[in-house]
A protein has these predicted regions:
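Structural motif
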Residues: 44-50, 85-90, 123-130, 165-169, ...
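C-terminal motif of bacterial Sec signal peptides marking the signal peptidase cleavage site
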Residues: 14-17
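Repeated scaffold domains used in trafficking and secretory/extracellular systems
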Residues: 63-74, 102-112, 145-155, 184-194, ...
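A short beta-strand motif characteristic of beta-propeller blades
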Residues: 56-61, 94-100, 136-142, 175-181, ...
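Short beta-strand elements that form the blades of beta-propeller/WD-repeat-like
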Residues: 33-43, 76-83, 113-121, 157-163, ...
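Sec-dependent signal peptide recognition
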Residues: 2-8
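Blade-level signature of beta-propeller repeat domains, shared across WD40, Kelch, NHL, RCC1
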Residues: 314-344
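An edge-strand/N-cap motif at the start of beta-rich repeat modules
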Residues: 23-63
Length: 344
């Protein structure tokens, strides 16, 4: 099974729709038919697919492809699909609207009808990265100082979080912006903006610590991995997990087992979504009609030592306002890559 859960990969996966948190009043009610799920394949010869939360198949990928990014904009859904042989495609409502064997898409947002993508060359003859609008290059990013991981776009205002920055900074509308109060290298970050309000989750700071930065104030977090940050209605939301690591000896080797609680931190107040003897993570959040929907993923991770390998078994849940929803038959047994809510 494709894990897609390593920190540096998560820096490239990240958020659900970039512009689906605004103007909720005219939206229809949410049902299982308009919650769409990008689901990882667990069967040989069958690719990833898009299904409804009820279980109906919307789109089936080819056997040699997998979904890297999934989002919605109004009535439309989009997926960035990668090919194991190289190259990528952008799918809109089941139709290919972009294809390349020379560039790969790191992240994508849809804003006011425009498609924004972070793209880099494939294979990589030079270190280069571009911000594109409707698949046309509009900015060349300063790769030696800043490598992006994830972006947000709000009415043409583009901000990028670093997967790596030489000095503590983020990129916004063509310029690197220093993060007041921080210095040194940063790794694996996530960003959201609301005008002058800027929130950045940082998985590795110069002291190898995790924390989040908001408008010059930095808060460190213990034993935490961040998977998404959001600014909604003036409140900050940090999604991730709080983990513990146990080291034991068995089969004459060193074994490690990681367990974690899926958490959400709202304006500094932590709430546990899911706990247990597994690795749980709050992975992606959408606000729709003033309700919060959160994807929670659960992994069973066996011990690793010189005699054993790691076995991952996934379960996935959608929480609505902190409570798990009842989904279609066997949906929770699937490995959900990400989810989106479609206007019907």
């Amino acid at each position: 099974m494709k894990t897609k859960l390593m920190i540096m990969m998560l820096a490239m996966l990240t958020l659900t729709a970039c512009n689906n948190d605004d103007e909720p009043n005219s939206r229809p009610d949410v049902s299982l038919e308009n919650i769409y799920l990008a689901v990882s394949s667990t069967e040989e010869g069958i690719g990833d697919r898009v299904i409804t939360a009820k279980g109906d198949i919307v789109y089936q990928c080819d056997s040699l492809t997998w979904i890297r990014r999934f989002l919605a904009d109004g009535r439309d859904w989009y997926a960035v699909v990668y090919n194991y042989n190289g190259g990528c495609q952008v799918i809109k409502n089941g139709n290919i609207i972009y294809s390349s064997h020379e560039e790969e898409i790191v992240d994508m947002c849809v804003d006011d009808g425009n498609i924004y993508t972070l793209q880099e060359p494939f294979p990589v003859p030079v270190r280069q990265e571009w911000l594109c609008k409707n698949f046309t290059h509009i900015y060349t990013l300063p790769y030696e100082q800043f490598k992006s991981s994830q972006m947000v776009v709000h009415h043409g205002d583009v901000a990028l979080a670093p997967s790596y920055s030489r000095e503590a900074c983020y990129w916004r509308n063509g310029e690197l912006v220093a993060m007041q109060g921080l210095e040194g290298d940063l790794l694996s970050c996530y960003i959201d903006t609301d005008g002058d309000d800027v929130l950045i989750g940082i998985n590795v700071d110069k002291n190898n610590r995790t924390g989040y930065w908001r408008n010059g104030t930095y808060n460190e977090l213990e034993n935490t991995i961040i998977y998404q940050v959001k600014l909604i209605g003036g409140k900050s939301y940090i999604l991730g997990n709080r983990y513990t690591t146990d080291v034991t000896n068995q089969y004459h080797g060193s074994a490690r087992r990681i367990t974690a609680d899926a958490i959400i931190i709202v304006d500094g107040q932590e709430q546990v979504l899911r706990t247990g003897d597994r690795r749980n993570l709050a992975y992606s959040m959408i606000q729709y009609n003033n309700d919060n929907y959160i994807l929670v993923r659960e992994l069973l991770q066996e011990a690793r030592d010189v005699y054993e390998t790691v076995t991952l078994e996934s379960k996935s849940f959608i929480y609505k306002n902190m409570k798990p929803m009842k989904l279609g038959n066997d949906i929770t047994k699937l490995d959900i890559i990400d989810f989106a809510i479609i206007d019907k």
